[in-house]
Amino acid sequence: MEWGSVALLGFSAINTINILRQSQLSLTERLIWIFYTIFFVIFIAEEISWGERLHGYGIDSIKAINTQGETNLHNIGAFQLKGLLHLGWAALGLLLGLGSWIIKDSPLLPDKKLSLYFLIPAIWYISFEFCRDGGSCPITVANHQEIYEFLIAIGLFLHTRLWRHRKTILNHSKTI
């Protein structure tokens, strides 16, 4: 499932690059899509442990404090133990899932019809943290986290796909 997320994020990055090639973008739109492109590249690099899974080389000092012994930042023990990673995922899910209900038609925020791709993971991460803090959690993060990361990746791919399609249609109608 993790490689599926990586593939969707890769396609999302390709979509953002194609959106950036459109000449009619405002400066604000261009900055938003540059931000998304950088976000996708970092997200992909973190998911594949900055290539360690592909070439086998890692940074020992990071691997030593990493809960999975990998070269990535998101599995560093301090982030995992304090719930910071989960709360970050929850905040991202809430922002992307609810943002378009407040700010309409912004390339920064996915369309309302994509809300559940972000809100379901946000609710799960928040619930997991409350459950874990209470000490009576029947679920484990390892068994479920990839599913929710995958949902977010699907939502981000669909968001970039919709905007890419929208910009292509706008360009085509202006040339007719």
Which residue ranges define each predicted feature?
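Non-cytosolic membrane-interface motifs at loop->transmembrane helix junctions
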Residues: 1-3, 137-149
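Hydrophobic cores of alpha-helical transmembrane segments in multi-pass inner/ER membrane proteins
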Residues: 4-18, 86-98, 148-167
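A generic, lipid-embedded transmembrane alpha helix
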Residues: 8-13, 34-48
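Membrane-interface helix-boundary motifs at transmembrane edges
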Residues: 19-31, 102-112
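Aromatic-anchored segments of alpha-helical transmembrane domains
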Residues: 39-46, 120-133
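Hydrophobic alpha-helical transmembrane segments
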Residues: 70-93
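Juxtamembrane "helix-exit" motif on the non-cytosolic side of transmembrane helices
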Residues: 101-104, 127-140
